From Swiss-Prot:
Binding of Na(+), residues: 75, 78
Family designation: Belongs to the fluoride channel Fluc/FEX (TC 1.A.43) family.
Catalytic function, reaction form: fluoride(in) = fluoride(out)
Domain of life from the UniProt record: Bacteria
Subcellular location(s) per record: Cell inner membrane
Name the record gives this protein: Fluoride-specific ion channel FluC
UniProt gene name: fluC
Length: 127
């Protein structure tokens, strides 16, 4: 039951952080393109890559902390459903090019961010 609590608390923190960053991005860059969702997914991919690498190669994270950070915080922070909804809206109301650009940018940049997170974690662990 304790793990559920920490996952839920992490999820709440991640959701609030996502809302804050998405709102800031929309105010800063406008609402013509889903910059906020792209930002949270790229940052979340990087952090999840780092968390996964640290959990796999060290004993720095207890199983409960790992779940709280990965499933909780990163699960609440990142958002695949918003990515889907915003991409559909771009295609439906703006242009196919904007929707396809969102798909390509999100997939490529998030994968690269995840790998970069793993590499950075490895280097930090190695000293």
């Amino acid at each position: 039951m304790e793990r559920w609590f920490w996952i839920g608390l992490g999820g709440a923190a991640g959701t609030l952080a996502r809302y804050g960053l998405s709102t800031w991005c929309q105010q800063r860059f406008g609402a013509e393109f889903p910059y906020g969702t792209l930002a949270v997914n790229v940052i979340g991919s990087f952090l999840l890559g780092a968390i996964g690498e640290i959990a796999a190669t060290t004993e720095l994270l207890s199983p409960t902390l790992r779940l709280s950070l990965s499933t909780g915080v990163m699960g609440g922070f990142t958002t695949y459903s918003s990515f889907n909804n915003e991409t559909i809206r771009l295609i439906e109301y703006k242009s196919w090019a904007a929707g396809l650009a969102n798909i390509a940018i999100t997939l490529v940049v998030c994968l690269l961010a995840g790998v970069l997170g793993m590499v950075v974690a490895r280097r930090l662990i190695a000293g």
